Amino acid sequence: MSLPDKAFPVSWDQFHRDARALAWRIAGLDREWRAIVAITRGGLVPAAIICRELGIRLIEIVCIASYHDYTSQGEMQVLKGIGASLLENQGEGVIVVDDLTDTGKTAAIVREMMPRAHFATVYAKPKGRPLIDTFVTEVSQDTWIYFPWDMGFTYQEPIAGGKRG
């Protein structure tokens, strides 16, 4: 499989550094946080890192699926909502975390549930950017990000093609 023209492969090390950078930015806001809501599945890894860095123990998930073929999003469906206690005060004091905002459709659904929550993503694309309060890296809309959990190691043919010298 070849990468698209605007591919952005992210290693585990790079993602960890970027998620910690996001935690630093959130810490710089100097606010009290009561919980993190991770948007599954992409928000699980950065949420774990941010929880650790900020000392937040209460973690919730919201699961929103868009049925797609990895080139276009389909209809959005909430598969698992957010617990009532975190919806109090419209999500005030809650950080909503995802790996990426692309079109902003997922963030818009969660923003309706929690309009006063703080939305944070590691990466942002221009269409989704207005819905996000804090992010680390912006990429163009036509860039495809390959996250480390989507990639695996594969055998690489030797440069010499197996010839012995």
UniProtKB/Swiss-Prot annotation:
Pathway: Purine metabolism; GMP biosynthesis via salvage pathway; GMP from guanine: step 1/1; Purine metabolism; XMP biosynthesis via salvage pathway; XMP from xanthine: step 1/1. Its cofactor is Mg(2+). GO terms for molecular function: guanine phosphoribosyltransferase activity; hypoxanthine phosphoribosyltransferase activity; magnesium ion binding; xanthine phosphoribosyltransferase activity. One of its GO terms (biological process) is purine ribonucleoside salvage. Xanthine binds at residues 102, 145. 5-phospho-alpha-D-ribose 1-diphosphate binds at residues 41-42, 98-106. It is found in: Cell inner membrane. Mg(2+) binds at residue 99. Gene3D superfamilies: 3.40.50.2020. It catalyses: GMP + diphosphate = guanine + 5-phospho-alpha-D-ribose 1-diphosphate; XMP + diphosphate = xanthine + 5-phospho-alpha-D-ribose 1-diphosphate; IMP + diphosphate = hypoxanthine + 5-phospho-alpha-D-ribose 1-diphosphate. Keywords: Cell inner membrane, Cell membrane, Glycosyltransferase, Magnesium, Membrane, Metal-binding, Purine salvage, Transferase. GMP binds at residues 102-106, 144-145. Guanine binds at residues 102, 145. Its EC number is 2.4.2.-, 2.4.2.22. It is a peripheral membrane protein. GO terms for cellular component: plasma membrane. It is an enzyme of class 2 (transferase). Belongs to the purine/pyrimidine phosphoribosyltransferase family. XGPT subfamily. PANTHER family: XANTHINE PHOSPHORIBOSYLTRANSFERASE, XANTHINE-GUANINE PHOSPHORIBOSYLTRANSFERASE. Purine salvage pathway enzyme that catalyzes the transfer of the ribosyl-5-phosphate group from 5-phospho-alpha-D-ribose 1-diphosphate (PRPP) to the N9 position of the 6-oxopurines guanine and xanthine to form the corresponding ribonucleotides GMP (guanosine 5'-monophosphate) and XMP (xanthosine 5'-monophosphate), with the release of PPi. To a lesser extent, also acts on hypoxanthine. Homotetramer. This is Xanthine-guanine phosphoribosyltransferase. It comes from Brucella suis (strain ATCC 23445 / NCTC 10510). The gene is gpt.
